Amino acid sequence: MKNRIFLAGATGAIGRRLLPLLLNAGYEVTGMTRSQAKALEFRGRGMRIVVADVFDADAVMRALRDARPDIVIHQLTDLSALAGSASPTAAISRNARIRSEGTRNLVNAARAVGAQRMIAQSISWAYGPGPLPHVESDPLDVHAGEPRSITVGGINALENAVLNSPPLLGTILRYGQLYGPGTGVDAPRGAAPLHVDAAAYAALLAVQHEAHGIYDIAELDADVVTEKARCELEWRDNMRLPEDAVTHIAV
């Protein structure tokens, strides 16, 4: 019997690409979104969808109790706020709050309902100063000045919560800078680029390989070493989904 999976952020850029991968692999999936309108897209698509705000701890607890997942996948961010905000610092702060308070609510609920594992999205550009390329054991830039400190603080809180909440086994996927459908960026740019399909693929592989710990996930680049993901997860950065696989889930 395949594991039951609870996907927080099911209608986000990565979530939409991850859903067909999970469903085609035979997993029983419950997706969470805060948007009622987006939830309506998923009716009759082979999965359950629940509407809940990650900042509402009671709502998150109810959603996970109903789903009874074996694995929780945390793909929540607020990329739309970062892209369209007139106040970048406010948008960064909201994203950091998702990573700190939102993650805490998910972890608490996952432990309460007996989930065995949590796989969470992080970023690969939060490392502190030091020689390149970075590896997973390098420290985060916890002494950065603002506004970078807001982002790194959120990442630090997320990773600590996911990795240090026994008996929950935690996996951190430190994604590079996303591009591709739904990200608002068409082509690779910046340090450690990553196509959104390859990001989703890494999450699927983390489920299948029962991986735990930290993995850098990015295209071959001078900034981070991704050998661990390529060897342990058999991940590859050139994985791409056929578009009809995605439109079958959400049009």
Segments the model singles out, each with a brief description of its role:
Residues 3-28:
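N-terminal Rossmann NAD(P)H-binding glycine-rich loop of SDR-like oxidoreductase domains
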Residues 8, 32, 75-78, 118-124, ...:
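SDR active-site strand-loop-helix element
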Residues 52, 57, 208, 223-251:
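C-terminal amphipathic/interface module of NAD(P)-dependent oxidoreductases
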Residues 83-146:
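Conserved Rossmann-fold NAD(P)-dependent oxidoreductase catalytic core, especially the SDR/UDP-sugar
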Residues 126-131, 143, 168-189:
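Flexible, glycine-rich beta-alpha linker
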Residues 178-182, 190-215, 219-220, 231:
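Alpha-helical substrate-binding/gating segment
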